[in-house]
């Protein structure tokens, strides 16, 4: 039983990131890599446990220096997130105004707001395509600029 409990405790430690398909654009000693990512974590709110799941794309800039690939930059493009009760008898406070948060990361914004953490509404996300397009343009320019 103690082993099971230890494994159960480990399940609730911090957020997890699962990285899926990776796309790479290579130009000599530089590359841009985009990775589809799912992030999930458990949160206890008002006596109920919720699973927060988020989907994003991680955009890495990497460069080969002296034969070693090194990360030069990392950006995250948020797609969407959700929170679901771990058991079906839990529910959300219907007074929560989720509309005040951006669609691509409204649940994590709610958790930050609730915890008094400042929320950045200008992160790249699928609900603000101009920010995403600017990020890709900057990565493309970096990739195609010689040293």
Language-model region placement:
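Flexible, membrane-facing loop/turn or short amphipathic-helix motifs
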Residues: 42-48
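A solvent-exposed, acidic/Ser-Thr-rich amphipathic alpha-helical stretch
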Residues: 1-39
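A hydrophobic membrane-anchoring alpha-helix module
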Residues: 91-147
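Short beta-strand edge/turn micro-motifs at domain boundaries
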Residues: 32-34, 55-88
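Intrinsically disordered, low-complexity regions enriched in Ser/Pro/Gly/Gln/His and often acidic
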Residues: 48, 62-65, 135
